[in-house]
Amino acid sequence: MKQGIHPNYHEVNVTCSCGNKFATKSAMEKENFNIEVCSLCHPFYTGTQKIVDTTGRVDKFNNKFGNLFKR
């Protein structure tokens, strides 16, 4: 490898908004890095995904405006 062309690869402390902290290696110049979502609080990994129920909205729309579009 050529000397002096590669970035400095060092340990970075990552802090999530949920309070989770972990260390990883990166070429970032910062020693500390803040993130908003990690695997402990992301809905995909926690299984707390919100499913939007649009069925009630469609029924409400059809009840309100259904007669306008019938021929």
Swiss-Prot record:
Coiled coil: none
One Gene Ontology molecular-function label: metal ion binding
Keywords: Metal-binding, Ribonucleoprotein, Ribosomal protein, RNA-binding, rRNA-binding, Zinc
UniProt cofactor(s): Zn(2+)
Positions that bind Zn(2+): C16, C18, C38, C41
Keyword Lyase: no
PROSITE patterns per record: RIBOSOMAL_L31
UniProt key word Protease: no
Disulfide bond residue pairs: none
Matches recorded under Pfam families: Ribosomal_L31
UniProt cofactor note: Binds 1 zinc ion per subunit.
GO annotation terms (biological process): translation
Quaternary structure annotation from Swiss-Prot or TrEMBL: Part of the 50S ribosomal subunit.
Protein name per its UniProtKB record: Large ribosomal subunit protein bL31
